[in-house]
């Protein structure tokens, strides 16, 4: 086995060298373990039309695998809903939970490449925090990620991205994500 060191993601290095110290100064924590960090990122793609055509879920699985670098979990309906022609156990979405290095690399690609590619992008809403520092937002189409070949898209799919932090308040979470490069709108 070689003694080569594993390359740390760029955003993770920046967090450890600059951002943690800045957050500690801003909020003056008594313990370094109180400094907020990103715990995980959950990327969810709902495919409601898969209830009528089961092949649609395969396109969502391949798109999400390309975007995140990890095989997504197919989510199935928990109960039947007759109005939607949905039966219990039918696949209706895909989800990926990213942690550690894959999470940091995804956040880096999201903030530096994907979000700037959105047409007429004015920034993320600072009001979508959940009260304890976690942030959730949606993207209208998967083509903003450079891993997706626009010519091979079978249909436009949006996705929900949930950034879970160890922050205890929205202000701490907002400061952490702003320092990581999330472009929030100014009120």
Curated annotation (Swiss-Prot):
One GO cellular component term noted in the UniProt record for this chain: ribonucleoprotein complex
A GO term for molecular function: rRNA binding
UniProt-listed Pfam families: Ribosomal_L5, Ribosomal_L5_C
InterPro entries hit by this protein: Ribosomal_uL5, Ribosomal_uL5_bac-type, Ribosomal_uL5_C, Ribosomal_uL5_dom_sf, Ribosomal_uL5_N
GO biological process, one term: translation
Keyword line: Ribonucleoprotein, Ribosomal protein, RNA-binding, rRNA-binding, tRNA-binding
Family of this protein: Belongs to the universal ribosomal protein uL5 family.
HAMAP family xrefs: Ribosomal_uL5_B (MF_01333_B)
Biological function: This is one of the proteins that bind and probably mediate the attachment of the 5S RNA into the large ribosomal subunit, where it forms part of the central protuberance. In the 70S ribosome it contacts protein S13 of the 30S subunit (bridge B1b), connecting the 2 subunits; this bridge is implicated in subunit movement. Contacts the P site tRNA; the 5S rRNA and some of its associated proteins might help stabilize positioning of ribosome-bound tRNAs.
Assembly behavior: Part of the 50S ribosomal subunit; part of the 5S rRNA/L5/L18/L25 subcomplex. Contacts the 5S rRNA and the P site tRNA. Forms a bridge to the 30S subunit in the 70S ribosome.
Protein name according to UniProt: Large ribosomal subunit protein uL5
Organism annotation: Mycobacterium leprae (strain TN)
Encoding gene per record: rplE
